[in-house]
């Protein structure tokens, strides 16, 4: 007779790596052109002046300056823009 029970198997034990999404530079902070402002899935934040959009919806600065967050349009969409440094 067996001295130990047979080892069971499980279908658990996997998880995906976190994608480190979110705001990387907050309102009022200085930023350099090309720096990432927000990493996101979909356009939770929309691009404003001096802000570009990557193919994965990442928002990045097109000019050096100060990051600003706010809303725009009739639908009050969350928007990010960069006030260019003079």
Curated annotation (Swiss-Prot):
One of its GO terms (biological process) is translation. It comes from the Bacteria. Keywords: Ribonucleoprotein, Ribosomal protein. The keyword Signal does not apply. Residues 1-10 have a biased composition (Gly residues). Residues 1-20 are annotated as: Disordered. This is Large ribosomal subunit protein bL27. It comes from Bordetella avium (strain 197N).
């Amino acid at each position: 007779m067996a001295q130990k029970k047979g080892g069971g198997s499980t279908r658990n034990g996997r998880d995906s790596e976190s994608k480190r999404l979110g705001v990387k530079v907050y309102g009022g902070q200085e930023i350099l052109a090309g720096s990432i402002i927000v990493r996101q899935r979909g356009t939770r934040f929309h691009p404003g002046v001096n802000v570009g959009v990557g193919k994965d919806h990442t928002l990045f600065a097109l000019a050096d300056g100060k990051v600003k967050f706010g809303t725009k349009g009739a639908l009050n969409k969350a928007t990010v823009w960069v006030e260019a440094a003079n």
